[in-house]
């Protein structure tokens, strides 16, 4: 099956990434993608865009040349309380909120601290998707996190970049996560974590993890624009009718 949705992409607004919104649209068209999310790093990262970047995402058109653009963020989990670096009413203006651990904001600690931070972020209601939870630098209680995510209708990400450019050693953790989410009745999403447009929609290694875990496709958010948009709508995002024509 060809997957037409990517929830995780960074633009030049995050200065360690190298592509513009226009670049991503062009690649999405070339590859036949129907929907992708702009999710630059939250403002607590050293080279992240200013807070205003996320507020002003509303200027982006919803659909360009048949490609839908979700206005999002990859927020930073800041502490074991699960707080993120974007807040309040501004969260409601975004279409999608990703959050994860990043070493400049939350240095690795211990399994109990990491687990509590993720569960608190999941239970906060502020986060739709937890990014790269299989990072071996941040060991977690996988069963507990998967159960919390399923209970709170938060998706966990299988991050394709973790097997290519960063977070080496994620494979075994990600297989365990996929199996735990499968058994808990939760949802997964594959994210390219693109930092250059050429990798948008690239899921080959993440898909191998999904298949090894025998994860049911009906609970994989990439399977269609409708699957992701329905998930986001159920999580309280109000402005998604604009994508009805996709």
UniProtKB/Swiss-Prot annotation:
Co-factor: note: Binds 3 Zn(2+) ions per subunit.
A Gene Ontology molecular function term of the record: zinc ion binding
Residues the record lists as binding Zn(2+) 3: 74, 102, 132
Binding annotation for Zn(2+) 2: 16, 41, 195
Obligatory cofactor(s): Zn(2+)
Keyword Methyltransferase: no
One GO cellular component term: cytosol
InterPro entries reported in the protein's UniProt record: Phosphatase_YcdX_put, PHP_dom, PHP_phosphatase, Pol/His_phosphatase_N, Pol/histidinol_Pase-like
Entry keywords, A to Z: Hydrolase, Metal-binding, Zinc
Keyword Disulfide bond: no
Residues that hold Zn(2+) 1 according to the record: 8, 10, 74, 193
GO biological process, alphabetically ordered: bacterial-type flagellum-dependent swarming motility
EC number annotated for this UniProt entry: 3.1.3.-
Lineage top rank: taxon: Bacteria
Class of the enzyme per the UniProt entry, highest EC level: hydrolase
Similarity annotation: Belongs to the PHP family.
UniProt protein name: Probable phosphatase Ssed_2939
Species name: Shewanella sediminis (strain HAW-EB3)
């Amino acid at each position: 099956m060809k997957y037409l949705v990517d929830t995780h992409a960074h633009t030049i607004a995050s200065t360690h990434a190298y592509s513009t919104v226009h670049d991503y649209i062009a690649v999405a068209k070339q590859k036949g993608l129907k929907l992708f999310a702009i999710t630059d790093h939250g403002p607590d990262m050293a080279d992240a865009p200013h807070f205003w970047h996320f507020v002003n995402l509303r200027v982006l058109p919803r659909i360009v040349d048949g490609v839908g653009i979700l206005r999002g963020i990859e927020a930073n989990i800041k502490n074991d309380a699960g707080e993120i670096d974007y807040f309040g009413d501004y969260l409601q203006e975004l279409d999608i909120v990703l959050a994860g651990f990043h070493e400049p904001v939350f240095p690795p600690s211990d399994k109990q601290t990491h687990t509590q931070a993720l569960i608190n972020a999941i239970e906060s209601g502020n986060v739709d998707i937890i990014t790269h939870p299989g990072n071996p630098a941040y060991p977690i209680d996988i069963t507990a996190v998967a159960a919390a995510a399923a209970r709170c209708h938060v998706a966990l990400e299988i991050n394709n970049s973790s097997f290519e450019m960063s977070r080496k050693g994620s494979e075994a953790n990600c297989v365990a996560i996929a199996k735990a989410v499968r058994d808990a009745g939760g949802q997964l999403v594959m994210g390219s974590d693109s930092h250059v447009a050429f990798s948008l929609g690239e899921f080959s290694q993440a898909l191998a993890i999904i298949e090894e875990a025998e994860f049911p496709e009906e609970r994989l958010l990439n399977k269609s624009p409708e699957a992701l948009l329905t998930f986001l709508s159920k999580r309280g995002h109000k402005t998604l009718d604009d994508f009805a024509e996709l």
